[in-house]
């Protein structure tokens, strides 16, 4: 008898599915027997033996067909080699979506750069990988770290960090159109150089008035002065001396210098809290420099010290220092002459304290030294002036740094104040030079009231203006003036002669007569016609 089907199947490598398929196809005509069932079924032994042999042979054939043996590996077809053509341009890709031939021709005419095959394809922007920041251990991790033995590791496993999902950005059609238009613009534009960064010029607003520097040979133009001022400010900001220098206005000198002359110069400062020099006590009083003798003696003393200690290279016959009361806003000025001499002028209106006189004189002597010693023309506050200023700071180290401009508040003797309550217009003058009968407030067209400054009480006293005259109210600009009277034209000739002369003038000029003769004849004829 042949080997049972299940034993053959167990010895082979066939799967369960192949077993079921072969069994169902071979014994489809037979019914399975159930030992537990109580129904009366036909027994297999009643079937003829011939049918059983046929079914077994069919089963064996099915098993061989169902790959009872080990399966063979799958066959892979070789990759096809595609003949690649030339790369498509952006215009060719766009033409594939357009059906009408007219629209294709129009696209080729409007955007020829899209069909240029020599152009490099757009490259995707490089993705920049951002480094992950490693955060410090949390509190509980630090606690575990403390309890770990010296050579051991904590048993607690670290939690794995969840990676963030990437955001998916869906771009609309309008964004795609905008990107396409920007791409076309980049194709058409020519490569340009990157813009150079603009140079910011520092502007200082804490200076009120600039000092004057005048030369007899040629006056400096305003544009050149502005350029020198800007360069000077940049030099001062970048200078290491200025960075290391402590602002003199914020500090108070308490120690007395060992040098007697430096002690005298330092005693003239308003914020000096140390012992004051005996010779400087006269000049630091509030009203001392109002007297001419004190101003002259202080200026002579300062000139002697500074020229001997710093500006010894300037000959005494080439330098002259005087007071000039006509300087109302400038603290001082240096006039350079063509013969090599220099004159320093000081303003008694601005230099009302000994400290202002000292600082202004040093400033102007630096200008004089650049002309007399260095022979530098139009130097201004350039490197030559800065060298002399640095020399002053090195000799007298306790003195403040020499400033380029002063910010002194100028005292005024007279004040012209608008009489209206809501208006705050105020004009300062050193003399009663404003005619209140002719001048009015430019803001509200009100009258001016004259006040005088009293130095004793530090108040303003109203006085009468000697130039004031009783006049009518000032008309505002809004009121229109009355039109002028019509002008009467007086003519030498009688009425109607103009028309008569125009009509008969050419009759006499054809005869070759002069203009005066023609007009005489016409006037004579016109009078005869009037008498008739």
Swiss-Prot record:
Bias (Low complexity) ranges: 14-32
Positions with biased composition (Basic and acidic residues): 1-10, 39-48, 94-107, 124-133, 236-251
Disulfide bonds: none
Domain of life: Eukaryota
One GO MF term: SUMO polymer binding
Tissue specificity: Mainly expressed in germ cells and early embryonic, proliferating cells.
The keyword Iron-sulfur is assigned to this record: no
Mitochondrion recorded as keyword: no
Biased composition (Acidic residues): 213-235
Record-linked InterPro entries: SprT-like_domain
Sequence ranges assigned to domain SprT-like in this UniProt record: 308-398
Record's subcellular location: Chromosome
Annotated stretches, region: Disordered: 1-50, 84-181, 213-253, 468-489
Phenotype upon gene inactivation: Mutant worms become hypersensitive to formaldehyde-induced DNA damage. Mutant worms exhibit significant reduction in brood size at 25 degrees Celsius and also exhibit a high incidence of male progeny at both 20 and 25 degrees Celsius. Moreover, exhibit a mortal germline (MRT) phenotype characterized by transgenerational loss of fecundity and vitality, marked by reduced lifespan, decreased mobility, and loss of fertility in later generations. Mutants have a mortal germline, where brood sizes become progressively smaller and the population fails to survive beyond 12 generations.
Keywords associated with the record: Chromosome
Oligomeric and partner information: Interacts with top-2; this interaction allows the resolution of topoisomerase II (top-2) DNA-protein cross-links.
Family designation: Belongs to the serine-aspartate repeat-containing protein (SDr) family.
Protein name according to UniProt: Germ cell nuclear acidic-1 protein
Lineage: Eukaryota, Metazoa, Ecdysozoa, Nematoda, Chromadorea
Gene: gcna-1
